């Protein structure tokens, strides 16, 4: 039984319980901070408000902007 106690003591010294994240440290518990860190799509420089259109250097000719509804095409 003393071997188990020694092993437990060594494990707790090498990996203390304070190293584990607690429930309060989860980002899901802090939505206000999570929203400040997250860049929404409206603030992204390559996003145009028209349903996912790009306005980067390649414009609608890039592969990401090929939908028919993009950039005024119907």
From Swiss-Prot:
Residues that make up the propeptide removed upon maturation: 20-74
A GO term for molecular function: toxin activity
Residues with the Cysteine amide modification: 71
Cellular component per GO, a single term: extracellular region
Residues that bear 4-carboxyglutamate: 58, 64
Keyword entries, A-Z: Amidation, Disulfide bond, Gamma-carboxyglutamic acid, Hydroxylation, Ion channel impairing toxin, Neurotoxin, Secreted, Signal, Toxin, Voltage-gated sodium channel impairing toxin
Name of a matching Pfam family: Conotoxin
Annotated signal peptide: 1-19
Cysteine disulfide links: 53-65, 54-70, 60-71
InterPro entries: Conotoxin
Tissue/organ expression: Expressed by the venom duct.
Keyword Secreted set for record: yes
Record PTM 4-hydroxyproline, positions in chain: 57, 67
Subcellular location: Secreted
Entry text on domains: The cysteine framework is III (CC-C-C-CC).
Function: Mu-conotoxins block voltage-gated sodium channels (Nav). In vitro, this synthetic peptide displays a low blocking effect in mouse extensor digitorum longus muscles (IC(50)=616 nM).
Assigned protein family: Belongs to the conotoxin M superfamily.
Protein name: Mu-conotoxin-like T3.1
